[in-house]
Amino acid sequence: MATYFVGDLQGCYDELQLLLERVDFNPTQDKLYLVGDLVARGDKSLECLRFVKSLGNAAQTVLGNHDLHLIATALDIKKVKPRDRVDAIFNAPDFDELIHWLRHQPLLVHNEKLNFLMSHAGISPDWDLKTAKSCAAEVEQILQHGDFHYLIENMYSEQPDRWSPDLQGLARHRYIINAFTRMRFCYLDHRFDFACKSPLKDAPAELTPWFNLDNPLYKQIPIVFGHWASLVDEPTPKGIYALDTGCVWNNRMTMLRWEDKQFFTQSAVKNYSDF
């Protein structure tokens, strides 16, 4: 049995299949973890959704910002962006089933046996393990069983940009969603910056990646995440695994085998900007 992690798919189905063939993935024995953003911009988002769903217990994904946006468009809260190339999902006979399944995916996975945390964007620099898990569960409960329409309709905000345990209601839930699905750079006082998406060397001096801030949790448990394609080939601290290597931006898809920490890569098989 082997455990694999793979970076953002974003509709890049063919590259995923090539990686799974290369590692001889066996869904009856192996497990595949996905860091979220299964959909958007690639040409086979529908195939990605159907495939991951079809794996059942052999796969586990987390929600990414593009996944949440797809749910928002399915609820008629947001309009479909042509560049996202998700029309096939909306025309699919299993559309409702796929959106229901996606909405029931977690924001955070903590595997105590294999000793890892996985989310789409990372873990807030102000959270310990207990807080991260309770915050994820709080929003997951609403998305899966509560007034998810109201939450998704009101989640689009960059405020609050700093954590406080006193946050309540929508402000609290916005921060939680942004931490798990949108976070990249932070100020030294731990405020989020959502404007900068550049490589580390080009970032303003006052900004630092979330994983370089002082949080004991970052050294206690390995963290696997995606979301940040411009981190490709950038060094990260020990135990911090950045797996989004920009396949949909014509770079490559990255897979990590957990047991021996071996990486596998697959270059984009097509120029997605040509579509």
UniProtKB/Swiss-Prot annotation:
It comes from Haemophilus influenzae (strain ATCC 51907 / DSM 11121 / KW20 / Rd). Keywords: Hydrolase. The gene is apaH. InterPro entries: ApaH (IPR004617), Calcineurin-like_PHP_ApaH (IPR004843), Metallo-depent_PP-like (IPR029052). HAMAP family: ApaH. The keyword Hydrolase applies. This is Bis(5'-nucleosyl)-tetraphosphatase, symmetrical. GO terms for cellular component: cytoplasm. It catalyses: P(1),P(4)-bis(5'-adenosyl) tetraphosphate + H2O = 2 ADP + 2 H(+). One of its GO terms (biological process) is RNA decapping. Pfam families: Metallophos. Belongs to the Ap4A hydrolase family. It is an enzyme of class 3 (hydrolase). It comes from the Bacteria. Hydrolyzes diadenosine 5',5'''-P1,P4-tetraphosphate to yield ADP. GO terms for molecular function: bis(5'-nucleosyl)-tetraphosphatase (symmetrical) activity; phosphatase activity. Its EC number is 3.6.1.41. Transmembrane segments: none annotated.
